[in-house]
Amino acid sequence: MSSLDRLRALLGKPVTWGWARPRLWTTSEQYLGVELPSDYKAFLDLYGPGSIDGYLSLSRPLEADATELERLWSLEDWRWSRLSAPDLYPYPFHPDPGGLISWGSDEHGSEYYFLAIEPNPDEWRIVVGSECNSWFETAGTFCDFLVRCFDRIDRPPFMDRAWPTPDARYHSHA
């Protein structure tokens, strides 16, 4: 069973989404200058923007206009923060080479990223930065990471220990 299939079994059928919009991903990828991981796009094509149990929020393009692309993908503020305090930010931020690309955030202020150092986006690592500047890095795809969170293995030590609950559901924000 693929990790996406496992997430479907864990989260249940999407309530309001469930369709692909390739043009929106193409526009985002043109804005970023890189392709995004295929399982990330597949998950968000299935479930849409929303959150898992209100804890982990995930965004995706809905219109792909300039304002939305900037809101979703720009990390300029983080890039400047890294320049002024490099010890607090051990990773570069996109569009710097090998920079982090944001894909989510949680209710405790942690930010979730792809570490875009491999030529193949399906081989990118996952990085999580906490609001206290603790960092966690792991291998595996987007869906693999979410499954491991459910299995409570190889997940950030600063992640809420009670999340996800066994009856976790995806809550659409669309």
Task: For every predicted segment, state its role.
Residues 106-109, 131-134:
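Short acidic/polar capping segments at secondary-structure boundaries
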Residues 123-129:
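Short polybasic amphipathic segments
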Residues 100, 121-123:
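A generic structural signal for beta-strand entry/edge sites
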Residues 109, 121, 151:
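Short loop/turn segments at secondary-structure transitions that flank enzyme active sites
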Residues 120-121, 134:
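Short, surface-exposed beta-strand-loop junctions and turns on beta-sheet-rich folds
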Residues 1-108, 158-163, 170-174:
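A surface-exposed partner-binding patch
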Residues 135-156:
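Compact, glycine/acidic-enriched structural inserts
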Residues 111-118:
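Short, surface-exposed beta-strand/loop micro-motifs that present aromatic residues
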